[in-house]
Amino acid sequence: MSLDIVILAAGQGTRMRSALPKVLHPVAGNSMLGHVIHSARQLQPQGIHVVIGHGAELVRERLAADDLNFVMQDKQLGTGHAVAQALPALTADTVLVLYGDVPLIEVETLQRLLAKANDQQLGLLTVTLDDPTGYGRIVRDEQGKVTAIVEHKDANDAQKAIKEGNTGILALPAARLADWMGRLSNNNAQGEYYLTDVIAMAVADGLVVATEQPHDAMEVQGANDRRQLSELERHYQLREGRRLMAQGVTLRDPARFDVRGEVSVGRDVLIDINVILEGKVVIEDDVQIGPNCVIKNTTLRKGAVVKANSHLEGAVMGEGSDAGPFARLRPGSVLDAKAHVGNFVELKNAHLGEGAKAGHLTYLGDAEIGARTNIGAGTITCNYDGANKFKTVMGEDVFIGSNNSLVAPVEIKAGATTAAGSTITQAVEAGDLAVARARQRNISGWKRPEKIKKS
């Protein structure tokens, strides 16, 4: 069975009170539409067709990709009208209709729905709610077969009492779709062309409407305002927390933990409160992450420890290495096994060899640091001349004294030592001691200046 997916993303979202198109509002660091597209791709369709309208150019700009076909809906005349705009591009056997503001839909739910769709049967995703206000109601006959969907504004009192609501997500036989679209009418309270009207048409044409439901009603929850958006965010985070805990992660408090990307984890991982994981994060076995950390596009090898209030981006921490508290590892930072980065240390494009240490109050940029080298407090690499970046290289077993300025390009070879307070501008040979500071001079009998008293 070949598959085309149509994603409806043309709505304005006036209740968001925003210049940003509704479908671009983020959930967990990705736009709502981005989440839907991600789920759609996992179904491996032959085409993904995104119907856009309000803010169309911005939506195209943010989400442009070779596998997406953007279809313009100039006037928002209803869901049926939106799907009709994509008709010329649909060539598969089955068409799945999704919504750009329903970001939590699970791929497994969609797979179950698609399994019920064929040339003689529609797949319709419904949801049973205690309060289905706003949802179209699923009307069934005495045998329990679906006969129609009635929109809330068009429903009578008996129909409004029905608890089963329409999610709008359905799988249709493509061969029938053009005929049904041509028969749609806007004779309703909204004056719109409802996609849901194809259900009654399908029944009249002798097709069966097979229903499926999500395991969790939040899967089909949309966001029309910022309160609903925040509810989606919190539900997504709790869902991700449950997923990670099932894989062997201890979360001190799943309600105070955020995932904003793709996270893979090992076993016996400990994550404290207020940790944010962004982008692609790999966490191996026995890793510990302290409170209030932000970790983005980073790999943490087995047994690595990230202490409180640290910020890591584009970094790799080797096995048994540690960073923090208050450490900042910027893109290109690599710590080999058992390397140590302490409090108020910043690394950028720096590689610390096995067992190397930078304990505190240090900036290391564009640096290659050998195994077991020790960097004294207050040391900085002077790597930028206002136009170009230069590299600092330190061999193995180097000892850098406190409060050093290492003016790149410069090399300090294996086993060398630099004295505290030095400004190193030239190469230091292996095993040498470099002293690059003014000699101390004491002035006897010196008196401090006195403040002039105001008259």
Swiss-Prot record:
Catalytic activity: alpha-D-glucosamine 1-phosphate + acetyl-CoA = N-acetyl-alpha-D-glucosamine 1-phosphate + CoA + H(+); N-acetyl-alpha-D-glucosamine 1-phosphate + UTP + H(+) = UDP-N-acetyl-alpha-D-glucosamine + diphosphate
Cofactor (UniProt): Mg(2+)
Residues binding Mg(2+), per UniProt: 101, 224
Pathway the protein acts in: Nucleotide-sugar biosynthesis; UDP-N-acetyl-alpha-D-glucosamine biosynthesis; N-acetyl-alpha-D-glucosamine 1-phosphate from alpha-D-glucosamine 6-phosphate (route II): step 2/2; Nucleotide-sugar biosynthesis; UDP-N-acetyl-alpha-D-glucosamine biosynthesis; UDP-N-acetyl-alpha-D-glucosamine from N-acetyl-alpha-D-glucosamine 1-phosphate: step 1/1; Bacterial outer membrane biogenesis; LPS lipid A biosynthesis
Positions of the UniProt region annotated as N-acetyltransferase: 248-455
Record flagged with keyword NAD: no
Classification via InterPro entries: Bifunctional_GlmU (IPR005882), GlmU-like (IPR050065), GlmU_C_LbH (IPR038009), Hexapep (IPR001451), MobA-like_NTP_Trfase (IPR025877), Nucleotide-diphossugar_trans (IPR029044), Trimer_LpxA-like_sf (IPR011004)
Active site: 360 (proton acceptor)
Main location: cytoplasm
A Gene Ontology cellular-component term: cytoplasm
Protein residues bound to UDP-N-acetyl-alpha-D-glucosamine: 8-11, 22, 73, 78-79, 99-101, 136, 151, 166, 224, 330, 348, 363, 374
Assigned EC number: 2.7.7.23, 2.3.1.157
Enzyme class, broadest EC rank: transferase
Cofactor binding note: Binds 1 Mg(2+) ion per subunit.
A single GO BP: cell morphogenesis
PANTHER family hit by this protein: BIFUNCTIONAL PROTEIN GLMU, NUCLEOTIDYL TRANSFERASE
Function: Catalyzes the last two sequential reactions in the de novo biosynthetic pathway for UDP-N-acetylglucosamine (UDP-GlcNAc). The C-terminal domain catalyzes the transfer of acetyl group from acetyl coenzyme A to glucosamine-1-phosphate (GlcN-1-P) to produce N-acetylglucosamine-1-phosphate (GlcNAc-1-P), which is converted into UDP-GlcNAc by the transfer of uridine 5-monophosphate (from uridine 5-triphosphate), a reaction catalyzed by the N-terminal domain.
Protein name: Bifunctional protein GlmU
The gene coding this protein: glmU
